[in-house]
Swiss-Prot record:
Protein's job: Catalyzes the ATP-dependent phosphorylation of L-homoserine to L-homoserine phosphate.
Cross-referenced Pfam families: GHMP_kinases_C, GHMP_kinases_N
InterPro entries registered for this protein in UniProt: GHMP_kinase_C_dom, GHMP_kinase_C_sf, GHMP_kinase_N_dom, GHMP_knse_ATP-bd_CS, Homoserine_kinase, Ribosomal_Su5_D2-typ_SF, Ribsml_uS5_D2-typ_fold_subgr
GO CC list: cytoplasm
GO molecular function annotation: ATP binding; homoserine kinase activity
Family statement: Belongs to the GHMP kinase family. Homoserine kinase subfamily.
EC id: 2.7.1.39
Protein name per its UniProtKB record: Homoserine kinase
Gene: thrB
Chemical reaction(s) catalysed: L-homoserine + ATP = O-phospho-L-homoserine + ADP + H(+)
The species this protein was found in: Listeria monocytogenes serovar 1/2a (strain ATCC BAA-679 / EGD-e)
GO BP, one annotated term: threonine biosynthetic process
Predominant location: cytoplasm
NCBIfam families: thrB
Length: 288
């Protein structure tokens, strides 16, 4: 059996800790034979465990402690610590592993709830489970979210080779915002969401680049954001914004501009991968 979980981008600018979008990069987990102990084969490196301390196995065992150990093989296109939901993908893969082997028959809603409990909020985990675009909130321990189709457009991901830990990126954020600024930040997010619902990527893109919640604070850690925005704007893109906590920057553009933008971004003197992606519509899947 095979489990496949997509990457995700969170925030989309002003949709801070609320908006998430599934992307066509994947964590894939092949479930092999039963074994005496858990072992997860991978070539990711970076100190990621091969035993039951791996997040995937740990998550599965928290849900189903009596699971029979298996040999697992993980391949992952999602680079860690780049703002593309790698930790959320691992958590969701663990939930799917337990659900499959223990025949828990969890609903998608239950999977989102469990994953959001582990991750703290649903902005990455909900699209990883459900696919497409999700707007969510965690209030008094309860998850509220809406899944909707995202407008058709090209997505160009500028993924620096250097990592940026979420903890470091969150560390530069203020504890509070002045009331007047928070009202303005909220109104910007509201217009962005309404524009997306109306398939108006021109207006949505304008709002994406006017975030007041987090990007101006994180820009000191991601100096290439301004460069990418200049390139994107000059070539007719809708917007460029941080993917999650960064350092990845995601460019939204008309499809006919995708290849030109990719080529232009590849010429920047920053060590990075520049990938053409799409919205992933299905979310986590199990292939038997």
């Amino acid at each position: 059996m095979r489990i496949r979980v997509p990457a995700t981008t969170a925030n989309l600018g002003p949709g801070f800790d609320s908006c998430g979008l599934a992307l066509t990069l994947y964590l894939t987990l092949d479930i092999g034979a039963e074994a005496d102990s858990w072992y997860i084969e991978h070539n990711i490196g970076g100190g990621i465990p091969h035993d039951e301390t791996n997040v995937i196995i740990e998550t599965a065992l928290n849900l189903a402690p009596n699971l029979t150990p298996h040999h697992l093989v993980m391949t992952c296109d999602i680079p860690p610590a780049r703002g593309l939901g790698s930790s959320s993908a691992a958590v969701v893969a663990g939930i799917e592993l337990a659900n499959t082997l223990a025949e828990l028959n969890l609903s998608k809603e239950e999977k989102v709830r469990i994953a959001a409990e582990i991750e703290g909020h649903p902005d990455n985990v909900a699209p990883a489970v459900l696919g497409n675009w999700v707007v969510g909130a965690k209030l008094d321990g309860e998850d509220f979210y809406v899944r909707h189709l995202f407008p058709d457009c090209a997505l160009i991901a500028f993924i620096p080779k250097a990592e940026l830990l979420t903890s470091e990126s969150r560390g530069v954020l203020p504890d509070t915002l002045p009331f007047k600024e928070a009202v303005q930040a909220s109104s910007i997010a509201n217009v962005m969401i309404a524009a997306i619902l109306r398939n108006d990527m021109t207006l949505a893109g304008e709002m994406m680049e006017r975030d007041l919640w987090h990007e101006k604070y994180r820009s000191q850690l991601v100096p290439h954001l301004a460069q990418i925005r200049d390139v994107a704007k000059n070539q007719g893109a809708y917007a460029a914004c941080l993917s999650g906590a960064g350092p990845t920057v995601l460019v939204f553009a008309p499809r006919n501009l995708a290849n030109k933008l990719q080529t232009s971004l590849q010429t920047l003197e920053i060590d990075a991968d520049v990938l053409l992606l799409d919205v992933e519509g299905s979310g986590a899947e199990v292939f038997r």
